[in-house]
Design a protein with these regions (language model features):
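Sec-dependent N-terminal signal peptides
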Residues: 4-12
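Flexible coil/turn and secondary-structure edge motifs
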Residues: 16-199
Length: 199
């Protein structure tokens, strides 16, 4: 029985990586088909496997679209295979397109902290590695202050037993992930990883 559970655990750790097809490095970089919509703002977060993070934010009223991608590292135009090595500095991240008249950036920050464990370093659920670390990206000083103030509030209220290790970083560049990662949870609801980890 112990051997079975150990094997099951090992399989689940690799599911997010192994459930996807290999990448053809000759493929052009994927860009979203959605044109920029007037009046929408963007927010960026990393909170583990982007398949599940994308699904969380897409369930929020006022969010129009969420894209999976990579951010927080140094490698230009990274692909999924490179990200999986943990040597690019990037984390799996999402770009959230939202209507600030319906949902505020502050609310998205609350959703972010409420949807993952911000006290674990380089890990979320069964996924391990720096590409799964927790990062709240900001694009201006106002967003940075909102993130920092909310972290201070969570710590003051002792919501989490352990210290929050979420990185608060300026967004340098967001790279879209390959097309097969987009809306992955929606298109693959019976994937074992999705059924076990996603909302």
């Amino acid at each position: 029985m112990k051997l079975f559970l150990t094997l099951l655990s090992l399989v689940s750790l690799q599911t997010c990586i192994s459930s996807t097809p290999p990448i053809d490095k000759k493929d052009p970089v994927w860009e979203p088909p959605l044109s920029e919509q007037k009046g929408l703002a963007k927010a960026y977060f990393a909170a583990g496997c982007f398949w599940c993070v994308e699904a969380v934010f897409e369930s929020v009223k006022g969010v129009h679209e969420v894209y999976s991608g990579y951010a927080g590292g140094e490698t230009k135009n990274p692909n999924y295979n490179q990200i999986g090595t943990g040597r690019t500095g990037h984390a799996e991240a999402v770009e959230v397109h939202y209507d600030p008249k319906v949902v505020s950036f502050g609310t998205l920050v609350q959703v972010f902290f409420g949807s993952h464990d911000p006290t674990t370093s380089n890990r979320q659920g069964p996924d391990r590695g720096s590409q799964y670390r927790s990062i709240a990206f900001y694009q201006n000083s106002s967003e940075r202050e909102m993130i920092q103030d909310y972290i201070a509030l969570l710590e003051k209220k002792e919501i989490f037993t352990n210290a929050i290790v979420t990185e608060v970083e300026p967004l340098d560049k967001f790279y879209f992930a390959e097309e097969y990662h987009q809306d992955y949870e929606k298109r693959n609801p019976n994937n074992p990883y999705v059924r076990r980890v996603s909302i």
